[in-house]
Amino acid sequence: LAELRAHPGKYSFGSPGVGSLGHLNLAAMNADLKVDVLHVPYRGMGPALTAAVGGEVQVQQDQYASAQSLIKAGKLRAIAVSAPGRLAGMPELPTLAELGYPQLNALGQTWFGLVAPTGTPDAVVQTLKQAVGRALADPALVQRLATLGAQPEGGTPQAFAQRISQTLAANRKIIETAGIKLDE
């Protein structure tokens, strides 16, 4: 942090594009940590990772599943993870929360969920929920997901809807505070 603060604008952060999760996390990091790291948007994560490996950008955030081979090959250096806990595949990496940045830890978490069209009958939603619950109870599936850096949670449709709403509100605040325009 001292280096970033001593040289505002010297370091750059590659993201898969304007308005992406990586872009929003950089904006939050700049504001929360009082640093000025330049955002360099690419056309997708592949080009952004290539830029990080090639030294075009000094900071990169990506999902463990797509970056792990580059990390293990020594082409990228992992610093921390933004996850509820340490990842099974790289238990030596601390979380951002462990490093003292809990506000950034929550923002950087990528999550996936199952959605259905509005108006889907409750019986269908419950059938899907139960099927997902059974799948997530399979130790082999949980182990496979862990190798990809995923930490399955399960839950209720209501809890997932609330998580979506909270994430949208947090992202909206970052976009407004940073003045991000999606047509940049």
Where are these regions (language model features)?
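Hinge/capping helix and adjacent helix->loop/strand transition within the periplasmic-binding protein
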Residues: 1-47, 59, 96-98, 111-144, ...
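An extracytoplasmic/periplasmic, membrane-proximal ligand-sensing/linker region
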Residues: 33-35, 72-73, 122-184
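A ligand-binding cleft/hinge motif common to bilobed small-molecule-binding domains
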Residues: 28-32, 59-93
